[in-house]
């Protein structure tokens, strides 16, 4: 996670959070990607989601994108887990996670807005490949028991993520 100053505005978009990150119990955290634990730390057990129930700083593209993570660290409203009915479970990488788009514009929100009767759960996480996505699906499927699973695959980089995951299993 890095801090940068936007050339156009000269503003440090993330500066407001630097002090927060240094606190013993921060209320805002940078996004955490599970693949960091595989590659850099060689961890055998780790969370598939990010840090739960905290405001997560997600992206910096001349504007700051943040979301409040759910109880498992995914990009969902927390109360979605309380609804017994799960119509659609989304699984995928950063596109599914909602990279650089505000929560109201991510794929989960767009599908949810299509029909207010639908309950859509997003288990996408940036930097994940097919093996990690399958593991997430396997971990949460019985808890969620969705009517449908939409597995969103991006051929540009997901094959490379799969190769990385197979090599670092």
Model-identified regions with their sequence ranges:
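Soluble or luminal CAZymes and related metallo-dependent hydrolases
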Residues: 103, 129-132
């Amino acid at each position: 996670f890095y801090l940068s100053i936007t050339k156009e505005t000269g503003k440090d978009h993330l500066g407001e959070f630097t002090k927060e990150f240094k606190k013993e119990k921060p209320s805002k955290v940078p996004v955490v990607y599970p693949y960091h634990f595989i590659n850099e730390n060689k961890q055998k057990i780790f969370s598939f989601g990010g840090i739960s129930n905290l405001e997560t700083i997600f992206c910096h593209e001349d504007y700051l994108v943040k979301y409040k993570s759910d109880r498992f660290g995914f990009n969902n409203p927390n109360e979605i887990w309380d609804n017994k009915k799960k119509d659609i479970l989304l699984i995928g990488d950063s596109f599914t996670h909602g990279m650089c788009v505000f929560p109201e514009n991510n794929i989960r929100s767009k599908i949810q807005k299509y029909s207010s009767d639908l309950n859509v759960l997003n288990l996408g996480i940036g930097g994940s490949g097919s093996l990690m996505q399958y593991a997430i699906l396997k971990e949460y499927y019985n808890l969620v028991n969705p009517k449908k699973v939409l597995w969103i695959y991006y051929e540009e980089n997901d094959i490379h993520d799969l190769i990385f995951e197979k090599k670092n299993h």
